Each structure stands twice: as structure tokens, then as C-alpha cells.
């Protein structure tokens, strides 16, 4: 239940710009995050080493830059960043983007 997890307010997530609010469940097998990316905010570019990431958009529109491509994930769509690849994401809209991100630990 994400409502039972304390919300973190992060400025410049992974070296990006703006605000990200996150409730994260973390154990030794995965990191599962319920996040709100504010208008104009972005993450920094980062690589998934020893993990991958799946981001599912609950509301809003998330612009994702993955390797050499740009894609827009809308409500009900997801973005997948395989292990070893780079990505960064941003909210190019005037509305919050709410998404669920799952980052398993690969062994």
C-alpha cells in the first residue's frame, strides 16, 4: 500500500531538473516506485546496470529519451529500458505525470 510509505520530495532526480515526488518500496530484489513528475521536470540521463526499468503511465504524458530515440508514453502505456541501456525522461506538459516504475535487481 503506497499510502503507507512516506513520500520523498526530490529536486533534480538523478541530476535532472525540477521536482519529483516518490513513494518507493525497496528490498533486495526490486525497487517499486509510485511517482509524480511535475510540469517541466526531468530526470538526468542514466544507465541501468544490473537492472532494467519498466515505467507505466497512470496519468499524464511522459516523454522518454531512450538511447537515440524519443517516445511519448500516455495513460495506459509503458516504457521499457533494458539492462545496459541509457534513458532519461521529462514532463513536457502543463500537468503532472503519475507513473509506476519497477526496477528489479538482476542476479
Labelled PLM ranges:
Residues 68-83:
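Short acidic-glycine-tyrosine-enriched beta hairpin
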Residues 51, 61-63, 70, 86, ...:
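Structural motif
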Residues 33, 43, 69-71:
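Short beta-strand segments
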Residues 54, 80, 94-107:
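A short hydrophobic beta-strand segment most commonly corresponding to one strand
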Residues 26-29, 39, 49-51, 58, ...:
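Short loop/turn positions at the edges of beta-strands in beta-sheet-rich folds
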Residues 1-31, 44-45:
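A short, N-terminal "cap"/entry segment at the start of jelly-roll beta-barrel domains
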Amino acid at each position: 500500500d503506497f499510502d503507507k510509505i512516506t513520500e520523498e520530495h526530490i529536486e533534480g532526480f538523478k541530476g535532472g531538473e525540477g521536482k519529483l515526488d516518490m513513494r518507493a518500496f525497496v528490498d533486495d530484489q526490486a525497487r517499486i516506485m509510485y511517482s509524480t513528475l511535475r510540469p517541466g521536470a526531468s530526470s538526468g540521463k542514466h544507465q541501468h546496470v544490473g537492472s532494467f526499468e519498466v515505467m507505466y503511465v497512470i496519468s499524464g504524458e511522459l516523454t522518454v529519451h531512450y538511447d537515440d530515440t524519443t517516445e511519448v508514453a500516455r495513460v495506459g502505456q509503458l516504457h521499457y529500458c533494458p539492462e545496459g541501456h541509457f534513458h532519461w525522461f521529462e514532463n513536457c506538459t502543463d500537468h503532472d505525470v503519475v507513473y509506476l516504475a519497477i526496477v528489479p535487481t538482476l542476479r
